[in-house]
From Swiss-Prot:
Source organism per UniProt: Rattus norvegicus
Compositional bias segments (type: Basic and acidic residues): 192-210, 218-240
Superkingdom: Eukaryota
Gene: Ociad1
Biological function: Maintains stem cell potency. Increases STAT3 phosphorylation and controls ERK phosphorylation. May act as a scaffold, increasing STAT3 recruitment onto endosomes.
Ranges of residues in domain OCIA: 1-112
Entry keywords, A to Z: Endosome, Phosphoprotein
Region (Disordered): 116-247
Name of the featured protein: OCIA domain-containing protein 1
Residue stretches of biased makeup (Polar residues): 136-146, 168-177
Modified residues (Phosphoserine): 108, 116, 193, 198
Position of the signal peptide: none
Other known facts: 'Asrij' stands for 'blood' in Sanskrit as this protein is strongly expressed in blood vessels.
């Protein structure tokens, strides 16, 4: 026993197996007879009346000038088209009636398939898949009533973990390469160091003027001039032998 009791409601509906009707299904004799009856009734009571009615309506529209006739064949093409449309419309309109006849047929796999399909469509979704209430209640009670031996086995199989100290967990969780130092503020010595004085444009211009004046004074100073720029030299006489003498 697995500890669960499976109860079913007395009025619970069980899904009926749908007969397998595939392409190779061979109808029974009663089904063949009903097929012939449906075909005959559909032809005489639906297809022929609708085809004739559509042809008459088409001819009336052509005679009134609402529909134009063919220049060579007249109204024949439109009448043929109206007849075909009425014929197939009659066959489609008789499908529902023929299905109802097959549903009333006893010992018919085709009728059973039609009845089962209609029953499934009429029921809400999930009707057959819904579990009884007794099953869920009993399963809930059996889950609480487990044996003590099962509890002991579960406790033995569970892994045991030793408590970890808080300090050890903090040390293990700390990433390597990162020190727990407090961010320090700016160095006061750096703040006390004299700041570089900003130079304005006027000061730079005055400084350039002073340097230019010093350079200009050096150029105009006679002591700095080259020897060639000084006064004219004294004339010296030279004889034909290249000797010089002063007068």
């Amino acid at each position: 026993m697995n500890g669960r009791a499976d109860f079913r409601e007395p009025n619970a509906q069980v899904s009926r197996p749908i007969p397998d009707i595939g392409g190779g299904y061979i109808p029974t004799e009663e089904e063949w007879r009903l097929f012939a009856e449906c075909h005959e009734e559909c032809f005489w009571f639906r297809s022929v009346p609708l085809a004739a009615t559509s042809m008459l309506i088409t001819q009336g529209l052509i005679s009134k000038g609402i529909l134009s006739s063919h220049p060579k064949y007249g109204s024949i093409p439109k009448l043929i088209f109206a007849c075909i449309v009425g014929y197939f419309a009659g066959k489609l309109s008789y499908v529902k009636t023929c299905q109802e006849k097959f549903k009333k047929l006893e010992n018919s796999p085709l009728g059973e398939a039609l009845r089962s399909g209609e029953l499934r469509r009429s029921l809400p979704p999930g009707h057959y898949t819904q579990k009884p209430k007794y099953d869920s209640n009993v399963s809930g009670q059996s889950s609480f009533g487990t044996s003590p031996a099962a509890d002991n086995i579960e406790k033995e199989t569970l892994p045991r973990y030793e408590p970890i100290p808080f300090s050890a967990s903090m040390n293990e969780s700390t990433p390597t390469g990162i020190t727990d130092h407090i961010a320090q503020g700016p160095d006061p010595n750096l703040e006390d160091s004299p700041k570089r004085k900003s130079v304005t444009y006027e000061e730079l211009r005055n400084k350039n003027r002073e340097s230019y004046g010093v350079t200009l004074s050096h150029k105009t100073d006679p002591s700095v001039r080259p020897m060639q720029e000084r006064g004219p030299q004294k004339e010296v006489k030279v004889n034909k032998y290249g000797d010089t003498w002063d007068e």
